[in-house]
A protein has these predicted regions:
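Sec-dependent signal peptide recognition
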Residues: 20-26
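N-terminal signal peptide c-region/cleavage motif recognized by signal peptidases
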Residues: 32-34
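Gly/Ser-rich catalytic/binding loops embedded in alpha/beta enzyme cores
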Residues: 38-216, 234, 295, 319, ...
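Glycine-rich, small-residue loops and helix-cap segments
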Residues: 53, 107, 396-516
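Short helix-loop capping/hinge segments that flank enzyme active sites or metal/cofactor-binding pockets
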Residues: 106-126, 295-299, 350-418, 472-482
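Flexible glycine/proline-enriched surface loops and loop-helix/loop-strand junctions
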Residues: 126-128, 182-187, 194, 243-252, ...
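A short helix-breaking turn/cap at a secondary-structure junction
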Residues: 232-317, 324, 508-516
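Acidic-enriched catalytic cores of C-N bond-cleaving enzymes acting on peptides and small amides
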Residues: 260-282, 305-338, 349-381
């Protein structure tokens, strides 16, 4: 009897011990989840946690996925989670267990705008139901670069449908596939676009890194109004192959992150020559860089096109730069830009007609829409889902462009690019400044699905047209809403822009309240 009692107690103690062990394991996972999803943000922080064995890549990926599942329904930032994300993370953990390092992005989860192709079961939709079955089974060049550097592809983000090139009255961040993306700081306000979900995802810490694409403002504007760092790279620096096109004259792929250092590191991974994108060239850009000049001559562009509150914040930013020992010079564009935006619109219409027809014609048999005219018809036939809030006047205009007028196109393209490049070059040369800055945009406006977007000021177009680097930094708030500061690089001088952006960012850390 006593032996039976001892045996029973021993078994019970063993059960309790096993339960406590499981609870401790669960507690460890919860701590790891909290650390990964709520505290770890930068690449350095994550890599430090890996090296200290405080978290695994699998735990990190699971933490982000759990966070996305919990918060994404309020924001519509993420369209799909990559089904192989945990498998990718396990492979990273296997390497770590062997003391191996996959690359500079070892175990770093990355979200991709849903116009960037990936292998596997996820479609690349550009936000359109016409591409809901567009499973390409192809990694875009930038995705190959990410994988080779050790990154984990975590999923696809929402976007303005067709990169905001469908309607003059569209609401940025809306797509038929993903619905309306909401600003990370106020769900009644707009996230800007077209890389809406990527910016909101970083602001909400759904991942440490996300990729966006830009034709004119589609990386920098969402980053600005959601308080994150972003880089629109120079033309030819990063390949666009495997990305649903808008305009090869201006399209760029660039990173968003929690720090300028991280954005810079990711860009160093993405860049490089790609035979499938003839604009690309070998780009010598080091991930780590040395700041050699501490006192800058900063050219400040006017802020009168932005909201009054943004103008006040800009004055504070300029004051902070002066307090940090820099010289601030008020400058303005002296070049006549009267034809610039009309020319830009024509080039974009021409490019989109030509390039989206080529893209659609080469999709798999699962995609039934094979041309721009077929896309327009598809939207009409699916009006209840596709044209619930706004139409497709831009698609119709693009479809009407005469692609045989190549001389007109080439002359227009030469004129507008020469004009934009000269305007930037003259800002530097005529004012003898080290760097040119401006507000990126005003704070996020109220989302209006009836009337569309309500922009107040933008600094993206010159860089977008000239093909030069454009960096945006979180630089304070207006009524609790983030506002970014733009660094507009001179032609062929991205390295200087990164260096100067770092100096400016450091000046703001102690003097300008940053979004949290």
């Amino acid at each position: 009897m006593w032996g039976f009692f001892v045996l029973k107690v021993t078994k019970q103690l063993f059960v309790y011990f096993f339960m406590i062990k499981k609870l401790l394991g669960l507690l460890t996972w919860i701590v790891a989840f909290n650390t990964s999803a709520l505290e770890l943000k930068t690449i350095d922080e994550i890599h430090s946690a890996y090296k200290n064995n405080t978290i695994t890549a699998q735990q990190l990926a699971q933490g982000y996925i759990k966070r996305i599942n919990q918060l994404n329904p309020q924001f519509n930032a993420v369209i799909n989670i990559e089904p192989t994300a945990i498998t990718q993370a396990k492979k990273i953990d296997e390497l770590s267990a062997q003391g191996l390092w996959a690359g500079p992005l070892h175990g770093i989860p990355v979200l991709l705008k849903d116009n960037i192709e990936t292998t596997g079961s996820l479609p690349t939709t550009a936000g359109s139901l016409a591409l809901k079955n567009n499973i390409t089974n192809n990694d875009a060049f930038v995705v190959k670069q990410l994988r080779n550097a050790g990154a984990i592809i975590l999923g696809k983000t929402n976007l303005s449908e067709w990169a905001n090139f469908r309607s003059s009255y569209s609401s940025s961040g809306w797509s038929a596939v993903g619905g309306q993306t909401h600003n990370a700081y106020d769900t009644t306000r707009n996230p800007c676009g077209s890389s809406s979900g990527s910016a909101v995802a970083i602001a909400l810490n759904f991942a440490p890194v996300a990729l966006g694409t830009e034709t004119d403002g589609s990386i920098t504007c969402p980053a600005s109004v959601n308080g994150v760092y972003a880089i629109k790279p120079s033309m030819g620096q990063v390949s666009r192959s495997g990305v649903v096109p808008l305009s090869s004259s201006q399209d760029s792929v660039g990173p968003m992150a929690h720090s300028l250092k991280d954005a810079r590191l990711v860009l160093s991974v993405l860049q490089g020559r790609d035979p499938l994108d003839t604009s690309t060239h070998s780009f010598e850009l080091q991930a780590q860089y040395k700041v050699t000049k501490s006192s800058l001559v900063i050219g400040a562009l006017p802020s009168d096109k932005f909201t009054v509150e943004t103008q006040r914040l800009y004055k504070k930013q300029l004051s902070a730069l002066k307090q940090a020992g820099h010289t601030v010079v008020n400058i303005d564009i002296s070049d006549d830009l009267a034809t610039l935006f009309v020319d830009e619109y024509y080039v974009l219409l021409y490019d989109f007609n030509k390039e989206i027809n080529q893209y659609l014609a080469n999709t798999s048999d699962q995609v039934k829409v094979k041309s721009l005219s077929a896309l327009i018809d598809f939207n009409k036939q699916n009006k209840a889902a596709e044209m619930l809030h706004f139409g497709q006047d831009i698609l119709i205009q693009a479809n009407a462009v005469d692609l045989t007028q190549t001389d007109k196109y080439q002359k227009t393209k030469h004129r507008y690019r020469t004009l934009a490049t000269a305007a930037i070059t003259n800002l530097y040369k005529n004012n003898n400044v080290d760097v040119v800055i401006a507000p990126t945009t005003s704070p996020a406006w109220k989302t209006d699905l009836v009337n569309g977007d309500n922009f107040k000021g933008s600094s993206s177009s010159l860089s977008a047209i000239a093909g030069t680097t454009h960096i945006t930094l979180p630089a304070g708030q207006v009524s609790g809403l983030p506002v970014g500061l733009s660094i507009i690089a001179n032609k062929n001088q991205p390295q200087a822009a990164y260096t100067h952006a770092q100096i400016i960012d450091e000046a703001f850390i102690s003097t300008i309240k940053k979004p949290e």
